[in-house]
Amino acid sequence: MTDPLALDPVLPVRQRSERPWNQDLPHDERFAHFEAHVTAGGKIEPNDWMPDEYRTAVLRFVEMHANSELMGVLPEREWIMRAPTLRRKLALTAKVQDEVGHAQLLYRVAEDLGKPREAMLEDLLAGKTKFHNVFHYPTKSWGDIGIIAWLVDAAAIVAQQALRDSSYAPYARTMQKICWEESVHIMHGRDVVVTLVTGTASQRELVQEALNRWWGPLMQMHGPRGDRAKDRDLHWRIKAKTSEELRQEFLTIYVPRLRELGLTIPDPELRYDDEAKTWRYTEPDWDELRSVVTGHGPRSQDRLEFRRLNRDDTRWVRETVLGLQAAAA
């Protein structure tokens, strides 16, 4: 794996302090220098001066990503004890551990932007902040676990790979590690799916039925089409691609792979338009997406309640550790 710091070296504090936007200049001049630097492909470090709009946008983006990693383990966690073999149990356990680790990394990135981790977790559990739509749905079979690990993680990594050049340097560096580990998760998921589709007729049907249920949420996952010119996350280079660009990339890669396995994609309108060089598909249900991510999904409240109970049960551990740290200070 390439060293993330080699891709995005952290400048010494003295050198960064000499940057124009870190100088004692009028706000408008600072803003102009900052905006020009970001637009030209430059990186921003936590100790740099940054406009409130930028800080707020990065924090919101990273916080939702962290929430999604933390909540995203729950659909798969439920299947660790029901995995069909010891090897599958170990692989699924390792995947869940990776995802929790990603959440820890991302909350740490977000903390540097001024919001304490406790506040982020409280907001998540109170339903004040969001997590990705796909983690609000139930997992009904082992086929779901294969589809999640292969296709949900694939849709995620399409977006995450575009974040490796985020203008906020700590986020970009963190994405190097996360993308590498997610690529392993995708291989695990594909192996589960291939094993099932090459097994018995009932095993193959398990995967097809799971794909039928998950296709809608998958197509919603990157969000509705938006106006590139009005997208402030694109303006600040927090992300690099529009929702539709990500969805098109996902379809280009994974539609052929699904068809290669003989699986039927549950969208009769799905086709590639050679003239327009784009995929045509049934418009996703955006009202459903908005309802789900605001806490009205099939398992939204169950998953949040699990996290609340888990947080209460482990409160004594946090209090003990913080007490020991305070005593040693």
Task: Tell me what each language-model feature is.
Residues 54-65, 83-102, 145, 170-182, ...:
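Alpha-helical scaffold segments that form or flank carboxylate-/histidine-based iron centers
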Residues 13-32, 95-123, 192-194:
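Conserved alpha-helical segments that form or flank metal/cofactor-binding pockets of metalloenzymes
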Residues 2-12, 205-329:
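Extended, helix-rich structural scaffolds rather than catalytic motifs
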Residues 49-54, 72-94, 156-171:
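Helix-loop segments that flank and shape redox-cofactor active sites
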Residues 1-50, 317-329:
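Extreme N-terminal leader/anchor segments
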Residues 43-63, 123-149, 166, 199-200, ...:
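Acidic/His metal-coordination segments adjacent to aromatic residues that form catalytic metal sites
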Residues 170-233:
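A contiguous pocket-lining binding segment that forms or flanks enzyme active sites
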Residues 135-188:
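Internal, conserved structured core segments that host functional sites
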